[in-house]
Amino acid sequence: MAVERTFSMIKPEGVRRGLVGAILARLEQKGYRIVALKMLRLTPEMAAAHYAEHRDKPFYQDLINHITSGPVVAMVLEGPGVIAGLRRLMGATNPQEAAPGTIRGDFALETSDNVIHGADSPASAEREIALYFTPAELG
């Protein structure tokens, strides 16, 4: 299986609830290497760029308001099959449907506060990594 890179973000409620360490531990225990990591607070412009594909959806403004409500932890992960593997480890978007043992199944409280984001495709991973990290930050 090819080594890939993907983008992931611990959302504001994950930071607020003190889950950063537990989530990072799960990612590393899975064998994923953290290539780059930073804590930041998204501006509305950064959030709009991140959620550009949802711009015309009725929930768009709620996404923007939520993701800018507090600091996030943005990261780049690397490993064989990391894009699909991270999606499995995160669990279903709706925490009520997420299996126990997944990050959302164990930590998320509701769909709007589902603790973690992960790129859903190689193209999304590339786009999102470029939004948050410079080539120099990626080593």
Curated annotation (Swiss-Prot):
Q: What class of enzyme is it?
A: transferase
Where does it mainly reside? Answer: cytoplasm
GO CC field: cytoplasm
Q: Which reaction does it catalyse?
A: a 2'-deoxyribonucleoside 5'-diphosphate + ATP = a 2'-deoxyribonucleoside 5'-triphosphate + ADP; a ribonucleoside 5'-diphosphate + ATP = a ribonucleoside 5'-triphosphate + ADP
Could you tell me where this protein is found in the cell? Cytoplasm
Note the InterPro entries from the entry.
Answer: NDK-like_dom (IPR034907), NDK-like_dom_sf (IPR036850), Nucleoside_diP_kinase (IPR001564)
Mind listing the GO molecular function terms for this protein? ATP binding; metal ion binding; nucleoside diphosphate kinase activity
Q: Which residues bind ATP?
A: 11, 59, 87, 93, 104, 114
Q: Which cofactor does it need?
A: Mg(2+)
The answer to whether UniProt assigns keyword Transcription to this entry is no
Matching Gene3D superfamilies, A to Z? Nucleoside diphosphate kinase-like domain (3.30.70.141)
Q: What Pfam families would the database entry show?
A: NDK
**Which key words tag this protein in UniProt?**
ATP-binding, Cytoplasm, Kinase, Magnesium, Metal-binding, Nucleotide metabolism, Nucleotide-binding, Phosphoprotein, Transferase
Q: What residues make up the catalytic site? A: 117 (pros-phosphohistidine intermediate)
On whether Disulfide bond is a keyword of this UniProt record, the answer is: no
Q: Biological process GO terms, please?
A: CTP biosynthetic process; GTP biosynthetic process; UTP biosynthetic process
Give EC number(s), comma-separated. 2.7.4.6
Quaternary context: Homotetramer.
| HAMAP family xref list | NDP_kinase
Concerning its family, UniProt says: Belongs to the NDK family.
Q: What role is this protein assigned?
A: Major role in the synthesis of nucleoside triphosphates other than ATP. The ATP gamma phosphate is transferred to the NDP beta phosphate via a ping-pong mechanism, using a phosphorylated active-site intermediate.
> What protein name is recorded for this chain?
Nucleoside diphosphate kinase
